[in-house]
Amino acid sequence: MDDLTTIPAPVWEQAGTTNAAMRVFVGLADPTAGKPMVLYIGSLFCPYCAAARWSVVAALSRFGTFSGLSYSASSSSDVFPSTATLSFHGGRYTSQYLDFQAVELQGAELVGTQYPTLETPSDEQERLIRKYD
């Protein structure tokens, strides 16, 4: 994981910027933590979430430290089966700059016909999901 969390500044600078069209939300700092919040909502079975976690960890590692992350894989029966990833479930992020909140909604392996619930968003997280999704 060190290769992911200790990317040298010159490598970041070479990556540059793109013209990708994406929505950016700018809001006020979270008054309880006194820092801007980054909210991640995903599910372990999802291969798109699996791919996104790598860049989230790499980017946020520039501003803080992750601990307790585990290696995982997306569902073996979904599109892009068994996509390698990290799991935020049970992990922690500490930073003097950002408040990172991760919610892993469901697991990666079917139990019967459903993926098991891992975590549930708080009321505030639900409000943000409804507002920005």
Please provide the spans of the model-predicted regions:
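Thiol/selenol-based redox catalytic cores and closely related redox-interacting motifs
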Residues: 71-133
